[in-house]
């Protein structure tokens, strides 16, 4: 009996990555700082972030950072029209992707790029393949995001510091 249950369980937990996830998996390995912003055009919290102009300013003031706006739970639509409205889509350090997953139902994605996804907007900061910061539950505060970007430029080494022993 156990033999029959195990294959069904394993098959039910496996999933294929979307093209957006595959592209992002390669991008976050970059030695440069990379921001992944998971959002959807229908989401009022995501819209509120755009209306403040914070994303536009953040992108313009950090040309060395690569920003990925990934529309999720939006039936494959990438939200480019809305990002264009706020001057984000045409920026040279911005890539726009759309995950094909639906907004509702059993096929709604619950993880993206190997991390849990239960709320949008969510903003993740990577450097050299390492997740440096994850803001998972709501609108980002742009001064905080800027501090995280600044901190992510460091090597995070404690060499030469005195031991606490």
Tell where the protein language model's regions lie, with residue ranges.
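Structural microenvironment flanking redox-active thiols in thiol-disulfide oxidoreductases
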Residues: 48-88, 102-108
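Short active-site neighborhood of thiol/selenol oxidoreductases, capturing the structured segment around
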Residues: 28-47
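Solvent-exposed loop/turn segments at secondary-structure junctions
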Residues: 40-45, 72-77, 100-103, 131, ...
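Loop/turn elements at helix/coil->beta-strand transitions in domains of secreted/extracellular proteins
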Residues: 30-35, 63-68, 90-93, 120, ...
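Non-globular targeting/processing and membrane-anchoring segments
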Residues: 17, 148-165
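A short beta-strand-turn-helix
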Residues: 17-34, 57
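Sec-dependent N-terminal signal peptides
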Residues: 2-13
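Thiol/disulfide oxidoreductase modules built on the thioredoxin-like
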Residues: 101-147
């Amino acid at each position: 009996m156990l033999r029959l249950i195990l294959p069904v369980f394993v098959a039910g937990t496996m999933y294929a990555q979307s093209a957006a996830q595959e592209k992002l998996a390669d991008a976050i390995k970059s030695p440069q700082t990379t921001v992944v912003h998971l959002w959807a055009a229908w989401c009022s919290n995501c819209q509120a972030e755009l209306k403040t102009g914070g994303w536009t300013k953040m992108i313009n003031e950090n040309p060395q950072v690569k920003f990925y706006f990934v529309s999720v739970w939006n039936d494959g639509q990438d939200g480019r029209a809305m990002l264009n409205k706020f001057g984000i889509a045409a920026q040279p350090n911005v890539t726009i992707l759309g995950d094909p997953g639906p907004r509702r139902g059993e096929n709604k994605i619950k993880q993206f790029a190997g991390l849990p996804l239960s709320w949008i907007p969510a903003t993740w900061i990577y450097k050299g393949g390492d997740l440096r910061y994850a803001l998972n539950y709501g609108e980002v505060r742009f001064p905080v995001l800027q501090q995280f970007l600044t901190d992510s430029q460091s090597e995070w080494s404690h060499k030469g510091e005195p031991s606490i022993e």
